[in-house]
UniProtKB/Swiss-Prot annotation:
Source organism: Pseudomonas putida (strain W619)
Annotated region (Disordered), positions in chain: 1-44
Name listed for the protein in its UniProt record: Large ribosomal subunit protein bL32
NCBIfam families with a match to the protein in the record: rpmF_bact
UniProt feature, compositional bias: Basic and acidic residues: 11-22
Length: 60
């Protein structure tokens, strides 16, 4: 079992944890439909960068 040889200071512990923060997802609004979607992803209506790339009717 691993056991530390010397105690880590509060500063060293906090510096290690400085990159652990979570951030919110970057959301975009589609210009043509107004749909909210993740950046660089197709919107729920099948539109990407103003163009219809997925026909929702064909999938069903």
């Amino acid at each position: 079992m691993a056991v530390q040889q010397n105690k880590k200071s509060r500063s060293a512990r906090d510096m290690r944890r400085s990159h652990d923060a979570l951030s919110e997802n970057a959301l975009s609004v589609e210009k043509t439909t107004g749909e909210v979607h993740l950046r660089h992803h197709v919107s729920p209506e099948g539109v990407y960068r103003g163009r219809k790339v997925i026909d929702k009717g064909a999938d069903e």
